[in-house]
Structure formats: C-alpha cells, structure tokens
Amino acid sequence: MNELMKIFGQVSGTQAFDQIKISIASPEKIRSWSFGEIKKPETINYRTFKPERDGLFCARIFGPIKDYECLCGKYKRMKYRGIICEKCGVEVTLSKVRRERMGHIELAAPVAHIWFMKSLPSRVGLLIDMTLKDLERVLYFENYVVVEPGLTPLKLHEMLSEEQYQRAVEEYGEDSFTAGIGAEAIRDMLMSIDLETLKTDMKVELRDTTSEAKRKKLVKRLKIVDAFIESGCRPEWMILEVIPVIPPELRPLVPLDGGRFATSDLNDLYRRVINRNNRLKRLIELRAPDIIIRNEKRMLQESVDALFDNGRRGRAITGANKRPLKSLSDMLKGKQGRFRQNLLGKRVDYSGRSVIVVGPELKLHQCGLPKKMALELFKPFVYSKLEQYHYATTIKAAKRMVEKERPEVWDILEEVIREHPVMLNRAPTLHRLGIQAFEPVLIEGKAIQLHPLVCTAFNADFDGDQMAVHVPLSLEAQLEARVLMMSTNNILSPANGKPIIVPTQDIVLGLYYLTLDREGEKGEGMAFASLNEIEHALQARVVSLQARVKARLHTIDENGAPVIRTVETTPGRMLLSRLLPRHTALPFSVINRLLRKKDITDVIDTVYRHCGQKETVIFCDRVMQLGYAHAARAGISFGKDDLVIPPTKAQLVADTDAEVKEFEQQYQDGLITQGEKYNKVVDAWSHCTERVADEMMKEIAKIEPGKPVNSVYMMAHSGARGSAAQMKQLAGMRGLMAKPSGEIIETPIVSNFKEGLTVLEYFNSTHGARKGLADTALKTANSGYLTRRLVDVAQDAIIVIEDCGTSRGITAMPVVEGGQIIASLGERVLGRTAAEDIKDTDGTIIVPLGKMIEEHDVELLEEAGIEQVRIRSVLTCEAETGICGKCYGRDLARGTKVNIGEAVGVIAAQSIGEPGTQLTMRTFHIGGAAQRGAEQSSVEAAFDGKIVMENRAVVGTSENVLIVMSRNCEVKITDEAGREKARYRIPYGSKLLTDEGRMVTKGDRLAEWDPYTVPIITEREGIAIYNDLVEGVSVREVTDEATGISSKVVVEWKNMPKGTDLKPRITLRDDRGEGITLANGLEARYFMSVDTILSVENGQRVKAGDVLGRIPREGSKTRDITGGLPRVAELFEARKPKDHAIISEIDGRVEFGKDYKSKRRLLVVPEDGDPVEYLLPKGKHLTIQEGDYVRKGDPLMDGNPVPHDILRVMGVEALANYLIKEIQDVYRLQGVKINDKHIEVISRQMLQKVEITEPGDTTFLVGELIDRTDFQIENEKTLKENGRPANSIPVLQGITKASLQTHSFISAASFQETTRVLTEAAVSGKSDSLMGLKENVIVGRLIPAGTGAMMNRLRALAATRDKEIEDSRGAEMVPVLGAAESFTPRLPEPPAE
C-alpha cells in the first residue's frame, strides 16, 4: 500500500526540476550511472533468442525482458518483486527499466573524446596550447610529444618523430626527459594543468602583450580556462577511460521474419569498440610488441570516434549495405535528429485528415465534420456516454456497438460533439491563423466542410487541399481552443491589424454587382417607402437591382437617435443596408457606393472597431450569404468577345515601330551609343504596351445603357479575380519579355492571347514562364528556412511586464518616396505609446505621454499636421528579460493593449516569414521585365502649394535655365500653414523649372533630367583644359563600327603601363591661362570616372552650366539590385551587401588625397579635429565632388550601406530606421502590409549583444561579446564595490548567429550546429533555466507564454506559500504535501480598471 501511495505523491516528471545543467562526465560519474560492465560483444543467442550474459543486451545488467520475470524463469509474478535470482542474476522488476539502466565499458587504454578534440576551436588544443594537426599526430600514434623536457634542450610540447625520439633517448638518457604518444600523453598533459595558476599567468601576459593576434589567442584560451574553473570540470575528463553504454531498449534489436534481425546502428558501433578493447587487453597481457599494441590502441581510438561522431574524422564507418552508420551525434543532429523529429514536433493521437470542400451554409464558427471521422475521433467520449446511459455494460460492449454503428451511437455522438470545439490545421502552417478552432457539425460524406471566409487565413482553396483535424481533450484545452483559437476570435491579422476574415472571389463579385448603379435601368426614378416595397418590386421585376431610385431609410443620426431620411440609391444597396449594424460611425454612405474588395474590407474594419466582435461576425456571415446569392443570380460569365482588342492598337504599334527605327538610325549615325539605343527602345515599347493597355481598359470599361456591363471588367475591377495586367496580355499586347539572365529582349510580343502568338513570339515567351516555375520551387524552400531562423531568434521575446518605465523611444515619420506619401504618420503610430507629450503648434497637448495612440488620436494628429512623433519602441525597451507592454503597444490581432505573456517574438517572425513565399526570388537588373516602366525623367507636383528648397545649389546657364549642382537637393511642397505635403529628390544635373517661394499647381513640372546619363557640369565660365587625359592611356577614341562616328571615352587607366599615377580631370582656366577658383575656394577641376564620354574638346570655351562629360547610367548601374526574399535575408543576416557603399563617419569637406595602386584616397576634413581617410575602389562612380560638404552617415559612393557601419556611425535608432525602411520596401513592392513593430522585435533580438571596449575592473575581456543585461548587472555590481565600470559598444548580429548565442543551450542545439553548441555548453557547465519557448517544448512543459505564463506565476506563488508554511511550522516540522496536493492558490486581486 505504501508503494501505491508513493506513486500518487510523485510530482510529474517534467515539473520536478527548475533547470537543466550539462557538463563533462567524470569517469566516476559514468561508473555510478552504470549497472555493470559489458565485457562481450555478443547481443542475443540466436537459438534461444535470450540475451547473452555480459553482452550488449545482458539481462543481469539491464533488467528483465518480461515484466516481473527473471531470465531462467525461477521467479515469476509480482510477489517476488525486487528479488535477484541467484541462478541467472536478474532482478525481478518491470521490463521498462531496460529503457533507463545504463552499462559501461572499461577501456584498456584512454581515448580522446572527439567532440572536444575536433569541434572547432579544439578545446583540448586550446588548453594545452597545441594545434589540432599536432594533436592528431600524437593521438593517432604518428609522433611523440615532449611532456616534460627536464634539463634537456628539448622544448615543451615539441613534436618528435620515431627516429628523433630514439635519438633523443640515446643522447640524453631515458630518464632525463618525458615524452609520450597517444591519448595517455595528452591525458598526462591535461592532468598536470593547474587552472588557477594558468589563469593568473595568462592575465599577466594579456596585460603586457602588444600584438593583436597574440591577444586574440590569449582571450580565447582565458575564456576556456575560466569555463573549466566555473563549471568545476577537470580538463583530463575530456579523455575517456570509461565509455557509457546507453540502455538496450533505446538501441533495439528486432527479429524480422526469416530468422534475421534488424538492429540499430549503435549496436554495430558498440560491438566494434568492445572487440577492439578486448583484443587490446589480451595483447597487453601477452606482452605483445609495442608496434602491435600501438596499432590496436589507434584502432580503439578510431572506433570510439565513430561511435560518438561517425564521419567527423576520416572516412565514415559503413555497415553491410555501404551506408554510413548513424552515430550518437547523428541521432541528435538535423531534421531527422532527436531534437527536431521527436522533441519539437511530435505526432499526436485523436487526429485525422481529409479533403476540404466549401461549406457556404455554415456559420463562421462552424466546420462540417464527416460522421465517420467524428466517431473515430471522439471514440473514448462515446464509450463513456454509452456506459453512462446503460446502453453498454463494459467498454468491450461499447466498442462492439460503435463498430456496428448502431443508431443510438449516432445520437450519442451528436451529444458528445455539442460545444466541443475541434482544431483544423492546413499545412504549411505559416502563421498562427493556420490552426483555428471550430465547432463541428456532423455531415454525411467524407470531406471536411470549411467556411469560405476563413480561407484567406488558411490560404486554402478547394482544388484538392487537405486539412487535419485535432481534438482538444482536457477541459483546459477546450477552453483555450474556444476562447483563443475560435475562428470568430481571429478576425484581425496579427501581421497588420487589418481584417483577415474578408470576402473573396464570388462574394466580392456578387456585392459588386449588387451595388452597381447604372443609367437607363428598368424602374429608374421610382420612389420607395420601405425595404419591403423594394423587395416586392424586385420580385415583380418592376425595378432592376442597379436602377437609380429614391428610398426612405430608417437610420440614426450623430447622437444615436432614430431618424428617417430619404436617400438616392439603388435597390441593391438598400438590400445591403439591411445587414449593416446601426451605429453613428456607420452612416448609409459607407455602402451607398460601388463596393470593391478594398471597400468591403474597410467596412468590416469599421464595424469591428465600433460595434465589437459579435456584430462583426454576424455581419460577415450575412454579407457572405448575400454575396453568394447575387453572384449566382447575376449569372456573370465571359466569352471570347468580352475581351475587346482596342481599335487603336495597330496604329500605336506602327507608331512605336517608326520611333524604334528612328533610334536605330540615330545609332547608325552615331548620335547615341549602343546602350542608349537599347534603353530608348525598351522604353518606347514599355510606353506603347501601357498605352495599349489603357486603351483596352477604356474599351472594356465602357458602360452603355441597356447593355450588360463587361463581365471581365467586373471581375477585375471588383477585385474578385484577375487584374489589369492579365487582361493586358489577353486583349492588349504581351509586351516585352526578359531573358533568363534578367535582361529585356528588345523585340516585344505585339500579339495578345486572343489573337494568338507567332512561333517566334511563343519561343521568346517561354523563357519567362520557365524561369517562373524554377523560381517558385526555390522560393518556397528559402522562405521556409527564413521563417525558421526568424522564429528561432525571436522565440524568447515575450511580454513580461506592463511598463519598463523607460523614457527613450524612436521618432516616427511618414514614409515618402517619389513625392508620394506611401505610409502616413498615422499608419505608423497607430497603436503605439507616445514617448513624450505630443503638442499642437500652439502648445496644447493632443496625446499625453504614455498614452496609447488610438484611431481618434490619429485623426487629431493628422488635423494638426504633425510631422513627427516620438513613440516608445521595442528597441529601446529596458525590461530585463522579454519586452514590456507599453513599448510594444497594441496587440494587432485583438486591437487592444497587449497582454502579459503574449509571445510577440514568434508573432513577429510569423508575420515577416508568412508573406515570404509571395516575394520574388529574382534579382533585378535595372529593368527586369515587370520591374520598370519608362525611366522616370521628371517630377511633377502632386499638390498645389508653395515651393521650399533644401540644399539648394544651382547654377544659371546663359539661357537662364537653372541647373541643380547639389547631390542631395530636395524640393518640398507646403500648404498655407507651412505643413509639408510632398517632397521630391532632384538628381544632380537636372533642369530646375521652379524655384524657392514660387506657387505651383498640381501637375506642374518641377524639374526634368536625362534619365540615361549623369552629366558633369561646370559652375563657371572658362576654357576647358584636359589634365591627365592622355590619348591611348586614359582616353580612347571609340569608333562605332555600325556608324563610323567616333567619340572620346575615358577608359580604365590604372592597368595601363603609364597610367598608375594619372588622375584624369578637366580644369577651367581664364583667358590669361590661370586656374579659376570656385566659391568654396578650391580650384575648378572635375574628375572623369571610367566610361565617361567627353563632351568638350581640349581648350574649348565653356559657359556656366555646360556639360563637360556624360557618364552613361548603365555604366554606374549594372549592379544587380538584390530584390525580394534574398534582400530580406541579407538584411536580417546583417551581411555586407555586394558592392557596398562606404559612408562618412563625420561631418566635413571632401578632399582627394594621393591615390594608391587600385584605391582612391578620399579625406573628409571636419571644421576642427583630424581628417578621416577612406579608401575607395578606383573607377567606382562617386556620389560627391571635391569640396562637397558631407554629413555624418552620408554615402560617399553608389551602393547599399553596410548595416554595421550605420550602427557604428549613427547609432541604434538610425540602424532600426534603415532596416525597417529597406525591409518594408521589399514587402511593399509586393503589396504586403506588415506592421513596423514586427521588424523592430527582430531587430531588438539582433542587437542583444555588446562588445567590450574597456573592461575597467569587471571580469570581462576586451573584445568579448556579452549579453546586454549581463553587462548592466556586472557593471552595477562593480560600481557598488567602487570599481571602474566597463565600456562597450552595441553589436549587430545576424539572426543565425544571434540564435546560436542565446542563453539557452537547449534552444541553440535544436536550431543548428548541434554538436558545437553542446560541446561548448558542456565545457562551461551551462545550466538552462528554461525561460524561452523552445526549451520548454523540448522538456515537455507548458510554454511560458499565454496561459503558460500564468501557470508559471501560480506555481511560483504556490512554492512561496509552501515555504512560508514550512518556515512557520519549523519547530514541529509536520510533513507537508507540496505541489502534489491539488489546491487552487488564491489569485492576486486583478487591478481595478
């Protein structure tokens, strides 16, 4: 009885510990785990099938094979429990002890552990200061090593070959020095290490050393010595004397039919080790010659290596079928390893899968579950109910009833299923909406029915997709499924806070058709008194759905009082108005318009924000019913004739053809270069394609009274299916195609699919199609991998506290590009916390500090015309672990303040990773087929207003045209109140058509420029003189073969024999031949970069604003622009972009220094202080001229900057803004909306570490990477002891690196490089306190997020209670049942809202 009580008293296995520690096992430890030594390589006796004694499956060591039965059968049954049989030596107990009891092998010679030997950096090598190569030569018996030189001239750790060793013995005598070979020598060396003295010596050396390489090495060694001291491991434990043998049930031997056996590879590997070990023992007993013993020892070392990590050194040992054997390391590694296969992802019971079909008559919270499936899934519940209602007396009887499918079983199934939610999942589960809970409705048939509105979230369609069903069993699980995962509770997308339950396809089309209004329809001008009248009229066919009529509408006014208004509308819209909830924020005007997909989404959003969740769900369901009904009634379909080919198409194509011929002629005459011709041709055709498409849309969109609206147009315009781009290919012209390399083929496809393509056109178009398919396959895998890395880096970002109390934040501004505001300020600050009082121009506070900015606040901000707002950000949050609620702001999926315990890191990772599959894989050349229309060559005002110039540097030409001379000139348009409406970047060399203070109206041209060349322009009048422009060295006359026209082009001069010191430039002289100086006091000289085409002759007179040379754009721009997924990955991995830009670290003027062989020297000279020197590759196009003033962080040349540089020069906020901008650009191009805070969360995880620059009195070392929180804690500790604190700089790490450096070694090991992570953790004796999500999943606990966070808090509460009770009873010490006693701790009172 006592034993039974013990079973109840046990705390469940996973809850019984707080942390997991890993360290190196000492030989004593290994022996203490073991239940006996394994001496024989035999496994089981092939006749009796019983395990051999002392073999790998020995029952005496590992326990009985059958429950409570010894091997010889003398003792059977429970009553002999615990007795050890004297005949066969087997303990009578449960057979499952064979899963937990270990054995060991005593090795006849020590053997090095391959993980500590080979995994880089080699731990053994660092400790005894030998290279890996030397170590291996000693280990595998090639060389001797001097362990103790004595008084001989030999050096410590010197390598001696066999002959050298023999010679040394003869010369100095055998006892004068010690040299060893094999693992014994290394073990002796490790044993002689005194860690403490080594540490002090190294610290002294580190202080005195001057060489950088030496310092790095010392720091590495110091770290390892420190690790050993802290973990309490001894270095010689890295050399094994005993090997543990894992329990036999974990490496089973299963009999197959036909007398053969299937076995785990580990048994082979163990047998090898045992055989060699036994042979070695015998050889030593026999006193065999040294060389034989040595060979045997080497073989033993190799077999142990193979057991631990097969294939790490030398060739992998293969089994009978030439396949490498799976070693212990392989069991853990990779997708099929223990971590990812069995611990992070398990297969679950009570689940099924089937094809899905559409279920339009379901409610949003329902799904149709096939009866057969439901019966199987809910079997235990059905059995219990059958017994409860006395239909069956035993489970067996109940089982028989269910198998026969008796009628009462179905009734009971109905009852069991009522209000018991099930979870549906569609693979791939890319974000959390890929699993949602529904209430099952029993249906006939074998397919699961899915509600159409949740298809967007699941990314499901009904072309054969399958979904899996899971049943939450426990009450808690059902509760969570209902409250958190029910489809009705997931109306908003966690990525951007917009509704994700949106009508698509047919529903959109139906609503569009319903809300069309057309002239000349039947019943136009009628007036109706009520909705019922309208319905009668529609049924009697007196009036059409789309006629313009007047109707009386019952609605509410601004204050919510019921009123009756007369409205001009259509019968269709009136039908829709019946569904709209009554609310002041939802006037009739929201639906009294043509509803396209986006409009419907907006309506749903408004309903959700103002009327709450329940109303929204009902509204969506009814809208869906209405949409389907009318899509069916409308009978919209299309035929070939609906695709109207524009009559002007032939003319447009002919015109463009003529234009292209003219370009061809200009090229023949030598007026333009090959590259310019290509650009112009491509542009002309792009333009033509667009014109044809526009004409086609005009034709198709024509609405004539009495004729039905064009069906294709309706589908595309409503957003149901198809797009203008697809229609363009069907009825316009296909346009230009790209080659596989990404270049555009000059000849376009003039035909469309309706006319049909010619053979040549068809051939040209296959390129793109094939590339598309190849891309898609690659993309999916890459995107999945990106998501995995993101989840891994962010998994421990959890909301832990309400407010961290920081005053820091970041500045939010609207995103402006090409003059258009892409993301308004409101969009960026909505749902964030204000980091300071936001004031109007007159000083009234709009939003106080610490308040969350809601929708109505955003309206106030926009009215006040505020340009920038300081908001709290995850990046500046000062919570010690995790993130605080205030810095995060609104939970996007709920629209309310974020809850404590929300796993925001994983949500961020999913939100960024999920659209990954939509991003392109292509790396564009400037001008990938779809990527560019005509090059932009001018800017036009988008608003009326007044011009304000920034960085205005212009020069007036003789014709009084203003030419922009500044590299970063911007034109702003402001309204009367001086608020910025738009801003445009004006490139260098543009003609400025307006000026400071002028008024412009919308559509005015502000500036124009040549899009294909970058000009080099003079600022003064004078005579142009060539300098270092040497014919045949730095300048070549290039004659175009096709045209015979020649032009002077600057060529790559630094490879020429005479050209190394040249600096090709044009200088200006006045009439007296003296150099002209510019306004900034420097002489007027203009450097010519490679490929510049000279526009002036030597000695020619030039006026201000004249062009001296043109740099063709393709010359400076053939760099690929990395787009799409690769760009996102490059940013998150913090890689240096190829052809990266160098940025200035200080403000100052630019000067050119003396050049080196292949680099140009550029100096930035500040007002005061030392100039900073940069080396730029020669011939790269610089974005600046000599004498320009650059600001800190400005790029000095073309290209993307390196994120690390931005962090170093400009700080964390600038880096965050850069990352957000760049990543958002990629997603915006695909039309994907992601909230900034997700990118901020990932950026925070990338910025967790700091690099020590000055250790002060702390224990840190220079250059060490330390976690930010650890750094602060250590500094506070040092300050308390009146020491000097350490200094550090923030470090940016890529997501892979950051994941591998997390606090938790379990999480890192399950991500990548498992052996390396575990080796490192073992050496430093790390303990994992199970703070993140992954570690807890692996040990089988609730994750510390959401409801799990609450459980953790309760557990901590209970533990402190127990401790208090125990302390108070300390005197009499009554035994207290701890966590086993099931009591509900009182929850702390909820704070008053």
Curated annotation (Swiss-Prot):
UniProt remark on cofactor binding: Binds 1 Mg(2+) ion per subunit.
E.C. numbers: 2.7.7.6
Residue positions binding Zn(2+) 1: 70, 72, 85, 88
Catalytic activity: RNA(n) + a ribonucleoside 5'-triphosphate = RNA(n+1) + diphosphate
Gene Ontology CC entries for this record: DNA-directed RNA polymerase complex
A Gene Ontology molecular function term of the record: DNA binding
EC main group: transferase
Subunit organization: The RNAP catalytic core consists of 2 alpha, 1 beta, 1 beta' and 1 omega subunit. When a sigma factor is associated with the core the holoenzyme is formed, which can initiate transcription.
HAMAP family assigned: RNApol_bact_RpoC
UniProt similarity note: Belongs to the RNA polymerase beta' chain family.
Function: DNA-dependent RNA polymerase catalyzes the transcription of DNA into RNA using the four ribonucleoside triphosphates as substrates.
This protein's name: DNA-directed RNA polymerase subunit beta'
Organism this protein belongs to: Rhodospirillum rubrum (strain ATCC 11170 / ATH 1.1.1 / DSM 467 / LMG 4362 / NCIMB 8255 / S1)
Lineage: Bacteria, Pseudomonadati, Pseudomonadota, Alphaproteobacteria, Rhodospirillales
Gene designation: rpoC
